[in-house]
Amino acid sequence: MSANGAVWGRVRSRLRAFPERLAACGAEAAAYGRCVQASTAPGGRLSKDFCAREFEALRSCFAAAAKKTLEGGC
């Protein structure tokens, strides 16, 4: 039972660190948001993959943040 508690302790600490790590992706999130907003504005040209470059940058940043969280690094 104590081993199970140790596992949950590690999981909780990783989950607590995750929002801080995602905060480092603010520039990517803002760029993606601007792209989506521009494409849905009047006269915008919303189409599949229109913001793919911005989305990929955001996804990569989130993946890097998740990896750091799982590794327990800074």
Curated annotation (Swiss-Prot):
GO biological process terms held by the UniProt record: mitochondrial respiratory chain complex I assembly
Keyword Mitochondrion annotated: yes
Methyltransferase is among the record's keywords: no
CC terms in the record's Gene Ontology section: mitochondrial matrix; mitochondrion
Effect annotated for changing F55L: In MC1DN34; uncertain significance
Residues covered by the CHCH domain: 22-69
Short motif (Cx9C motif 1): ranges: 25-35
Major localization listed first in the record, in broad terms: mitochondrion
Protein origin, superkingdom: Eukaryota
UniProt keyword annotations, A-Z: Disease variant, Disulfide bond, Mitochondrion, Primary mitochondrial disease
Chain positions of motif Cx9C motif 2: 51-61
Cellular localization per UniProt: Mitochondrion
Disulphide bonds in the chain: C25-C61, C35-C51
Subunit structure comment from the entry: Interacts with NDUFAF5.
Disease: Mitochondrial complex I deficiency, nuclear type 34: A form of mitochondrial complex I deficiency, the most common biochemical signature of mitochondrial disorders, a group of highly heterogeneous conditions characterized by defective oxidative phosphorylation, which collectively affects 1 in 5-10000 live births. Clinical disorders have variable severity, ranging from lethal neonatal disease to adult-onset neurodegenerative disorders.
Chain's role: Involved in the assembly of mitochondrial NADH:ubiquinone oxidoreductase complex (complex I, MT-ND1). Required to stabilize NDUFAF5.
Protein name: NADH dehydrogenase [ubiquinone] 1 alpha subcomplex assembly factor 8
Gene: NDUFAF8
